[in-house]
Amino acid sequence: MLARALIRRRQAVTTLAAPSRARSTRSRALLDELGAGAVAAEGVGRARGSSKNAFVRATTANGNETLASAGDGGSTSSASSSSTTSGGIMVSAAHPSSHPQVLAVPLPRRPLMPGIIMPVKVTDEKLIAELEDMRNRGQAYVGAFLMRSEGSSSSSAAGKEEDAFDALTKRTVASVGLDGEEEEGADPSDHMHDIGTFAQVHNIVRLPADSPNGEESATLLLLGHRRLRKLGTMKRDPLVVQVEHLKDEKFDANDDIIKATTNEVVATIKDLLKTNPLHKETLQYFAQNFNDFQDPPKLADLGASMCSADDAQLQRVLELLSVKDRLDATLELLKKEVEIGKLQADIGKKVEDKISGDQRRYFLMEQLKSIKKELGMERDDKTALIEKFTKRFEPKRKSVPEETVKVIDEELQKLSGLEPSSSEFNVTRNYLEWLTSLPWGVCGDEKLDIAHAQEVLDADHYGLEDVKDRILEFIAVGQLLGTTQGKIITMVGPPGVGKTSIGQSIAKALGRKFYRFSVGGMSDVAEIKGHRRTYVGAMPGKLIQCLKSTGVCNPVVLIDEIDKLGRGYQGDPASALLELLDPEQNGTFLDHYLDVPVDLSKVLFVCTANVLDTIPGPLLDRMEVVRLSGYITDEKVQIARTYLEKAAKGKSGLSDFDATITDEAMSKLIGDYCREAGVRNLQKHLEKVYRKVALKVARAKSTDTTLDPIVIDVDDLVDYVGQPPFQTDRIYDETPPGVVTGLAWTAMGGSTLYIECTSVESGEGKGSLKTTGQLGDVMKESSAIAHTFTRGFLQSKDPGNDFLQKTSLHVHVPAGATPKDGPSAGVTITTSLLSLAMDKPVKPNLAMTGELTLTGRVLPVGGIKEKTIAARRSGVKTIIFPQGNKKDYDELSEDIREGLEACFVSTYDEVYRHALDWDR
């Protein structure tokens, strides 16, 4: 079979020797076809060139030796040689001294070196017949010439043997007449190199036809003898050339350079044997036939034949007649071969190490599994998973709903029948992982101790009495009933007042597990209710994740920023929360992933929001709202001293250093730098102050300077936090006619709001009103109502005053970049119009708020606490509130109401008496 692999379609001449293991295999296969017999090494004498039937001795790849006859008369060998070298086997044989004309045999890939046996395949019948005739006449000698390459090296062509040989064959056939045709006037020998090798045909073996046209082929064994030069063409069919036999240039065998180069070639060949042991047989044969390595010309040819260089480099060695130059060229090729061999060995070793390491680990793991399985210590993955799920589920079976028990049992049965490699196996495994991990009926211990809860809440937060009272009420009910139920508490207030942090304190006070997630910007319903299991990477919703994370069915869950829910093409999360936050429905909450009811009725939900306007009505209806107002200055001072200052010093590394802020500086820091309703900005400023103190302390330590305690006073604030961004809320110390102080509140807290009114032009029919200041539709309507009401009210108070009928008025609300809207400015705008019309200023240090109807009724408004705090911060002494807000004002603590006079009115006539009917 290996011999048949040597036969190629459309090949005229092919060298079968190659520098690789595969090429040696082909050579051995060919020799087997020729009838080479293996004999014992001890039973074979050394080859000698003087005998007619001298034997050529060579060592085969399997360790045996074969004999090849190379007599003077050209008799064929009874056994051929196998080669493990690049170009064949080096031999010593007798040969005639002169042949001026020889039959030319083209070699497509590698030149034949003297002393080397090379198998060659020919397919031309005429050439085969001529060679057989020459052998019968005892003149079986030819000239072997390497074909000239066209555009690419033979080494690259060897990678595409079929295409490259086809091209060479076409040129050879056209030149030497293997197909009976030739180019007019062209010398076919021009396609071959001028320097070749005088070779003896050792044997010719006919091979069976392997081409579509039934052509036969033959394989030659060529033994190279010496170099020759092609002088010209004598005959074209077949190609016979005139040659000149060449001899090596004379050299001094005792020359130091030649000796050194020879020794280096020998050493390099030994190095090559370490990386490529396939050359070892050739070297052993060479040592046996040439006594030692002190024959430089033969050593150079041997070394070149062992190299896998391209045809141009090997042809250069063949053409060198200078022994010194030939040794140098061979040494260069051998050095390259050694480096390539080392690189191949390194790559092979790395690959073998990796493969052997992986295989060893695999075998050990398999053995370990087998041992454990025999001992009953381990089962396969599927069995282990089923046991794990069963072990996890059995203790909870009695507390799990019957419907869920049925689903889990079915899924376990389904898992046992699935192959671990199937995709459904992973889906079922993940589903069971979630089902068996949930805390079915497992409730955490909670502390229903009012005193403990009060202590924890007061330790973490200052104020927030409404929230604290609600939690204490929740605990009290739980004490009396002996059990607690889930509730939905929503805390609404400006940023920085402690809504989120109070949720953690509630969990600590109750002794429950705490879980927080934010729904701000959430637009995917799957975040709440989970994904369908059919989707890749499906997961349950946040609430199911919460139960698995906490491991109990009664945690405190903080849903942050519920007023900022989004809405997109994935659905409406606000609508999904309806089921979650409904105490009547969340006992059987259905997650899309689990698809079994889950009891959330024992969960205490705490939601946070800045405003209620953006929360859908049906969702808001399910919540218990607790409002958190902003802090006044005194409260902020207490919070700063009790909580923020200590934390800021600790973060700055000043826990052991004496650095304090005076009370005056703290009040100024709050009043001029941190006027927001919460204390988050105050916390940032305190951290900034103590960071600068830390810088001073660090610099003092670096210079071994003792730093005195640092006291930060009012005058030092500029150095620590810069210039104050706020000066005062009051634009006017004394309001002129037409200017009134109003009160407003937003999600950021309360603030004072000035209403300014002035006349533009007067005359008959000019009684119009213009409004500016980015007023919303509701506020514009309030202005129109106020203008209409003021006309009638002015006539009742001052019948002869026709100012409003004849004057165009302009109402403006300062801070024009800030949008403003709401109905609570009605009484303020009316008072501003009356003040201008009557040319009478409003009572000093007075502010008001309230919605005015067209008939003069004053309706209640919201944000009483925030507005009261804003009025006090601005230095207001008297506040006019609607009568309907008296209950809200009475609920305020004494420290907020201290120093304020509140006037409650139900009609505008009462507003007029408090604001305009006063003596200057």
UniProtKB/Swiss-Prot annotation:
Phylogenetic lineage: Eukaryota, Viridiplantae, Chlorophyta, Mamiellophyceae, Mamiellales
Subunit structure as annotated in this protein's UniProt entry: Homohexamer or homoheptamer. Organized in a ring with a central cavity.
Entry protein name: Lon protease homolog, mitochondrial
Alphabetical keyword list: ATP-binding, DNA-binding, Hydrolase, Mitochondrion, Nucleotide-binding, Protease, Serine protease, Transit peptide
Sequence similarity: Belongs to the peptidase S16 family.
Function: ATP-dependent serine protease that mediates the selective degradation of misfolded, unassembled or oxidatively damaged polypeptides as well as certain short-lived regulatory proteins in the mitochondrial matrix. May also have a chaperone function in the assembly of inner membrane protein complexes. Participates in the regulation of mitochondrial gene expression and in the maintenance of the integrity of the mitochondrial genome. Binds to mitochondrial DNA in a site-specific manner.
Catalytic reaction annotation: Hydrolysis of proteins in presence of ATP
Organism: Ostreococcus tauri
Location(s), subcellular: Mitochondrion matrix
Catalytic activity, EC: 3.4.21.53
Domain Lon N-terminal: 102-338
CDD domains in the cross-refs: RecA-like_Lon (cd19500)
GO terms under biological process: cellular response to oxidative stress; chaperone-mediated protein complex assembly; mitochondrion organization; oxidation-dependent protein catabolic process; protein quality control for misfolded or incompletely synthesized proteins
Root EC class: hydrolase
NCBIfam families per record: lon (TIGR00763)
Comp. bias (Low complexity): 75-88
Gene3D superfamilies: 1.10.8.60, 1.20.5.5270, 1.20.58.1480, 3.30.230.10, LON domain-like (2.30.130.40), P-loop containing nucleotide triphosphate hydrolases (3.40.50.300)
